[in-house]
């Protein structure tokens, strides 16, 4: 078994994702901080943090990788009917900190501790992290957040407090992202929720090839301006 790399506090270098462990799947390195510079370096190499508040930062690059490829979004018949009469309206970058906070309150979001929240807040302030909000009667009832890397978007977490709210956030964002030149949506690890929307697994090596291809490209102007999205 290959040893876990301890990150150097004075360097933002990461080992190559191919050096990640197979068990636990994708564990690559430990330590470092959650500064915007380190997080940015990680995402540009296909690496993301995931750890409990009681742990040191753990850095991952799993194989396979879950993605949604343009044109492969799946919207079931029941959800399609819901979208035609949705009571929600959806925005971009109107309430980033609230979205992260609500994601952290989910049972599955217990890994989103204070350090994680502060780290992504810094990325948001530098224009690299973004949120999508779902509103109902002036209350946020769903949303998602993630990190933009060129024309690739790395989804981090989503939450829903009303029926289909997180799916509405994802679908509205998917169309918005593609209209602005988006080329790939990274879902990291496949789960039932993302699979129902059309996510599939691809080899990590293939994902890294996409990443290298897309990370230095630019989206069309205006993608991340505060705005209302259409479903």
Curated annotation (Swiss-Prot):
Which EC number(s) does UniProt give?
2.3.2.6
Provide the top EC class: transferase
The question of whether Transferase is a record keyword is answered with yes
Could you tell me which cysteines form disulfide bridges? none
Q: What is its main location?
A: cytoplasm
Give the SUPFAM superfamilies listed for this entry: Acyl-CoA N-acyltransferases (Nat)
- Would I find DNA damage among this entry's keywords? no
Pfam families from the UniProt entry: Leu_Phe_trans
Catalytic reaction(s) noted: N-terminal L-lysyl-[protein] + L-leucyl-tRNA(Leu) = N-terminal L-leucyl-L-lysyl-[protein] + tRNA(Leu) + H(+); N-terminal L-arginyl-[protein] + L-leucyl-tRNA(Leu) = N-terminal L-leucyl-L-arginyl-[protein] + tRNA(Leu) + H(+); L-phenylalanyl-tRNA(Phe) + an N-terminal L-alpha-aminoacyl-[protein] = an N-terminal L-phenylalanyl-L-alpha-aminoacyl-[protein] + tRNA(Phe)
Q: Which superkingdom, per the lineage?
A: Bacteria
Entries under InterPro entries matching the protein = Acyl_CoA_acyltransferase, Leu/Phe-tRNA_Trfase, Leu/Phe-tRNA_Trfase_C, Leu/Phe-tRNA_Trfase_N
Membrane spanning stretches: none
Taking the record's annotation, the residue ranges forming a coiled coil are none
Q: Which family does it belong to?
A: Belongs to the L/F-transferase family.
Q: Which PANTHER family match?
A: LEUCYL/PHENYLALANYL-TRNA--PROTEIN TRANSFERASE (PTHR30098), LEUCYL_PHENYLALANYL-TRNA--PROTEIN TRANSFERASE (PTHR30098:SF2)
Q: What does this protein do?
A: Functions in the N-end rule pathway of protein degradation where it conjugates Leu, Phe and, less efficiently, Met from aminoacyl-tRNAs to the N-termini of proteins containing an N-terminal arginine or lysine.
| Identification of the protein by name | Leucyl/phenylalanyl-tRNA--protein transferase
Q: Report the gene name.
A: aat
